[in-house]
Amino acid sequence: GGPNFLPGEHVYAAAREALEKDSGQYGNNRGSDALLDAFLEHIEQIGMTGYGRVNCATGIGAKHVIYNLAEALLDEGDTITFPVPYWTSYLDMAEIVNAKVDLLPCPASQDYKMTPAQLDVALAKKPKVFLFNNPSNPTGMVYTKDEVHALADVLVKYPDTWIITDDIYNRMLFDGLEYTNFVMARAEWRDRGLLIDSLHRPSRRRGGPGGVSARRAGGARAGAASDRL
């Protein structure tokens, strides 16, 4: 997750300017308008249309945003399911909110990728949340467009499960690999799909994290979760 090069000078210049123009006042807890607008511009580039500032919230890194969502969506005893290998903090965050965890083993023999059949079995157990990570940390695996759409098709059958898709590495692809947006794969569950993205990863600012989430407007349950953040 850590590139071996430093941010460009424009990143440092923007940080200096922000410090020099600091008002000393509290800001919007969702993030400044300029920050949210920059994120909205990015998600439009990856195919997410129909979103506005009200659909977004920022945090001190994607970990902070995912934890906020765990607190908002998961009550004690609820189940969250996600593939293995997984990013190191997923399990800890689930344990902090006293959620149950259903792990889906995805060994090297299947390229560390979850299959639609695996997901179908897991969702039949009625988890509250399905957490998806693409491109993957720690494996570096990237699902193809066809693979993303096959998984998205399965989720249509389970309308009571929230989908959190951790896509913070979507602009860090190599070897001709392409990213496919999971939230936009099927309109049927878009209102309960929550995209996690990063503002610091693509600019290599690991010491200055900024995470962002976006959810579609119009879903009553999505609005309820947002209000609890």
Which residue ranges define each predicted feature?
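Short acidic capping loops at alpha-helix termini that bridge into adjacent secondary structure
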Residues: G50-C56, E76-T79, K126, R190-G193
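A short helix->loop->beta-strand "cap" motif at the edges of active sites that frequently abuts
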Residues: D78, A99, L155-W162, R190-D191
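Active-site phosphate-binding strand-loop segment of PLP-dependent enzymes
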Residues: P107-L177
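Short beta->alpha connector loops at strand-helix junctions that form conserved
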Residues: V84, K100-A108
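Conserved PLP-anchoring active-site segment centered on the Schiff-base-forming lysine
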Residues: A72-A94
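N-terminal small-domain helix-loop-helix segment of the aminotransferase-like
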Residues: G1-G61, N68
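Conserved core segment of the aminotransferase class I/II
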Residues: A13, R186-L229
